Amino acid sequence: VKKQCKIPFLLAAAMVLVAVVGSVIGWKLIRAGSYRDLLTVETGDFASEVQEISFDQIPMLDRDSATKLGNRKLGELADMVSQFEVDDDYTQINYKGRPVRVTALRYGDWIKWFNNRSSGLPAYLIIDMVTQNVEVVRLDSGIRYTTAEHFGRNLGRYLRFHYPTYIFDDPAFEIDEDGNPYWVCPRITNTIGLFGGTDVLGAVLVNAVTGETAYYEVGAIPTWVDHVYN
């Protein structure tokens, strides 16, 4: 009995030891040079490389205000307000040259999910950060893959099934220039110790409607994607 108890204890102790050592060798205090080298510093000319923008392109709306506008807009939609809620995404992106926030919907509760799961989430919201206009984009086919879904269509489980060896950062809800909804899921790695020096290797794009996935290395990610590095 003692031997049987000793083996699990030793395994647990070994795991704790590895975690502690991995954390220590990644401390910023002793690996400052390695963290410094994560970024390549290049000399440039700010005036020539950064374009000026006009006043009508300057975002005037913060996330909290966008959330209030989104909830208010959903409350005006009699066919949706009883079944759905606005999700907490509100991702800031550049859409057709305009600063906007986009967010998906989510089911109000388990019963509403059960009643609507076959058709998916019917729309997403676009909030213009300059004009404060809120647009409800209704979809021909509903969004079926989200962070608020259940079982196999939950985004986290879906990614784990398709990319079991990848480590992902937090996904971001975005739309391409044609208004198609996607989840941008950065693939990350730790380059300093076991847990430090997080770097991005690429990103998996998941079509939120069809579930189609594609992986892109950092240099090949589509230009419309805004959220790869957090």
Language-model features, listed with the residues they occupy:
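Soluble extracytoplasmic regions of secretory-pathway and membrane proteins
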Residues: K2-N230
